[in-house]
A protein has these predicted regions:
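Long acidic/polar interaction regions in large eukaryotic complex-forming proteins
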Residues: 2-11, 93-101
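N-terminal acidic leader/helix
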Residues: 5-42
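Generic signature of intrinsically disordered, low-complexity segments enriched in small/polar residues
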Residues: 8, 23, 42-44, 86-91, ...
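Residue-level detector of solvent-exposed, low-hydrophobicity positions
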Residues: 17, 27-29, 46-48, 90, ...
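Secondary-structure edge/capping motif, primarily at the C-terminal ends of alpha-helices
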Residues: 17, 42-50, 77, 81
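Beta-strand/loop-dominated core regions that host nucleotide or nucleotide-derived cofactor-binding catalytic loops
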Residues: 50, 54-57
């Protein structure tokens, strides 16, 4: 499955989002990780029959499409919010967000 973001980049977004209580990017990142796990499971699942193989391929194909959509979603979110696309660092404006909300 093609990946735009590696696990370290996604984890960095999750870590920063949790520290600064900015849950939306973290939720998208967690969904991406879950889709990767589902895909890997389907690719390694036992195929005891042609029907099993078809079921697993169908789920894997749908998961791959969903993964692509969610990675594009993450890319757009990071662009909209102004995250650094090289270091995956949260912008200062978002870091101050929780303080204003209190």
């Amino acid at each position: 499955m093609k990946e735009q973001f590696d696990a370290a980049q996604i984890s960095k977004v999750i870590d920063q989002a949790l520290v600064y209580q900015c849950a939306c990017p973290a939720q998208v990142c967690r969904a991406i990780f879950e889709l990767r796990e589902l895909y890997e499971y389907q690719m390694s699942c036992a195929n005891d029959s042609a029907n099993d193989a078809l079921v697993h391929r169908t789920i894997a194909a749908a998961t791959e499409k969903s993964h692509e959509v969610m990675e594009e979603c993450l890319k757009k979110i990071l662009e909209i919010e102004g995250w650094d696309q090289v270091t995956f660092t949260m912008p200062q404006a978002l870091k101050k967000k929780p303080a204003r909300a209190l």
